[in-house]
Amino acid sequence: MGQLLYTEQKVQTLEAAFLKQPQVNCPVVHRFGPGIYIREVSIPAGTLSIGHRQTTTHLNVMLAGRVIMISEDGVKIEIAAPQTFVAGPGRKIGYILDDMIWQNIYATDETDVEKLEAMFLDKSQTWQEHQKNQQLLLSFDHSEDVADYYAAIAEYGFDHDTVQVQVQNLDDQIDLPHGGYKMMVAPSKIDGKGVFATASLEAGEVIAPARIAGKRTPAGRYTNHSKNPNAKMILLDNGDVNLVAAMPIVGCKGGNLGEEITIDYRQALSLAIRRN
């Protein structure tokens, strides 16, 4: 065990320098159960990881790996899985010696990951500025996707206003069922909010239920249209609908979200007609 001088200013300086470097794959799986949210991150060996500040006291479980951790009070210690402990609010820096799987476990009934991050993670000013810059750099031209969206809904007799009324209708919406998901809803460059991969997805992998017993989950409500989609809707025998990856989809790198998950609304609307 050793003692290192630690200040938030120094951490943010280090954070800014590392954010300029290529980011490694850091898949995040969001797991939900009755009254519980588990945020599970996997980080490869050889990675220096700077965590967001945790805002609450909560349970931590290290399922696999070995890491040299520097806590907010400057204490350096090597820990190896398996470990289970309660940690208070604060920020950690770790150098991953062996591939690591870490779970932060929170007591909550909330299932909206965007809201959960706002509740439990305090993201630094350095990180927020980096994200804004990334958004400017990654402002792809989605005009073809938007034009194709209008064409797709017109083919089925809808206009944008009618679609928006349905999107905003709260009567047919339902939370995702308990389970683990490699996705979250976040602001989209295509339109409003979209669904993004937080861990890599393989072709044919079920991303999430999109419709259950006639009600839309967040995956059914927020998945945007693309002229070149990477996912599709699959109708099940019981009438429910799953959102499924149509090709490999890249997940989180560092703390950055992965690819936006998109579908062709023509394909989704054709399923709706079959279902009805």
Label every PLM stretch briefly:
Residues E40, S71-R91:
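Short acidic-glycine-tyrosine-enriched beta hairpin
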Residues Y37-Q54:
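Conserved short histidine dyad/triad with adjacent acidic residue
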Residues G51, I70, A87, P209, ...:
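A generic structural signal for residues embedded in beta-strands
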Residues Q54-D73:
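Glycine- and acidic-residue-biased ligand/ion/polar-headgroup-sensing regions
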Residues K132-N276:
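Conserved catalytic SET/PR domain of SAM-dependent protein methyltransferases, capturing the structural core
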Residues M1-E40:
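A short, N-terminal "cap"/entry segment at the start of jelly-roll beta-barrel domains
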Residues T47-I50, Q83-G94, I101, I207:
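Histidine-centered metal-chelating micro-motifs
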Residues L97-D141:
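Double-stranded beta-helix
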